[in-house]
């Protein structure tokens, strides 16, 4: 049921963005883009994340509405213009995937560093000794 709720939330957000954003931006320019962001993304975020159509577990990768909106946009063009649109978008999808992997690696490194610093603050150090000196002592098992 969780998958079905998420799929419904992604579909609603994707269809509304793909049908409303472009006309607003074309008719009202940059203001239309900001207006679309406000009147589409705000309520869709509320429905999907606050109400809970899209559930993100604490120990799982975070999947946001952008994935559903992106897939909806790609598939809309495939249905309207043919499979060539999917083929022409593959390089962009590949670069997005590479960027996502790199972002995940950087985020994991940052999270690991933050956890290490948090643990260091929790442990009591000897007066006059900095964290590096204490780590060196612990590695050499002198303590």
Curated annotation (Swiss-Prot):
Signal sequence segment: none
Predominant location category: membrane
InterPro entries for the chain: DUF6905
Location of this chain's protein in the cell: Membrane
GO cellular component, one term: membrane
Membrane topology, as annotated: Multi-pass membrane protein
Transmembrane annotation, as ranges: 6-26, 27-47, 60-80, 90-110
GO terms for biological process, alphabetical: glycerol metabolic process
Keywords: Glycerol metabolism, Membrane, Transmembrane, Transmembrane helix, Transport
Upregulation: Repressed by GolR.
Stretches for region Disordered: 118-143
Pfam families from the UniProt entry: DUF6905 (PF21846)
Domain of life assignment: Bacteria
Known role: Could be involved in the glycerol uptake either via facilitated diffusion or active transport.
Protein name: Putative glycerol transporter Lin0368
Species annotation: Listeria innocua serovar 6a (strain ATCC BAA-680 / CLIP 11262)
